[in-house]
Every structure is written in C-alpha cells, then in structure tokens.
Amino acid sequence: MSTEQSVTEKQETQVGFGSALGTGSLLMTLAGIAFIGYGIIFLVLNFIGGGFELGVSHLAGQTPADLDPTVAYYISHLHVATAGFIISTGIAVTALSWFGVRRRQLWAWTTAVVVAVSGLIIALPMHYMGGFAHDWVTHLGPIYLAVIVFVVGVVLAYKGL
C-alpha cells in the first residue's frame, strides 16, 4: 500500500497558510489586489486630480488645464485605458494566484508571473529615459512595493508547488 498521494489528491489537498505555497500564493494574491488598487487610484485621479497622473503634477511647467482641451482629453483617454489594463492585470494575478497557485497549478503560477512581468517590462523603462520629471515615490513607489510582495510570493509559492 502506497502512502504517496496522486497528483490529483495533492492538488486537492488544502494548502495551509503556514506553508511556503500558502504564504506565497497569499502574497501573490495581495500583490494582485494592490495592482487593482493602484489602477483604481490611477483612474480616479484622472477625473479628480490636478496633475497629469499620480506623482506627475506638471510637464514642462504646464498642468493639464494649460493644454488645448483636445490634447488634454486625448491624454485623459490614454490614462483611462492604462488604468483599465492595470486593473485587468491585477484581476488576472489575483484570480490565478488564489484559485490556481493555491491549488498547486503550475500553469496558473506561470501565467500570473508572465502577466505581471510582461506589463512591468513594457511600462517601467519609459520612466527612466528622462522624458519628464516625476516624483518616483508617489508615481512608482506603490507599484514597486506591490512588485516586491509579488516576487517574494512567487519564490515562496514555487518552492511549495
């Protein structure tokens, strides 16, 4: 009689939050929720904020109110789209982490990592090319904090898969 669990039984076993997998998947989930929160703040500030976006109050000495209304609207519509994609990424990471990674689904772990990393690899380099001044603590700080939580979660979860 074998005492080892089959793959299906192992996947269905409840993951304890003291385990590497449990803690890792929880941290990945919390990071996904943080991505959603950042996207919501990004979206709301588009409509009620005084600057261009979080941590960017002016560009070349101008505020959005100084711009031609058509240009300001165009920038606004790009911010809404960006916020939508940040929120969507957060939803994907949250769902994959909570419902897939926690159940030892390697495909869910891989997809959550690819979704988050691809978005960050595309978005972050532009912030360091010197095209505009921004307060990096308020502009990127929340995302960096969420990324640190995510990476710790990714490593812990992988150890438990």
Language-model segments: which ranges?
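Topology signature of small-to-medium multi-pass alpha-helical membrane proteins
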Residues: 2-161
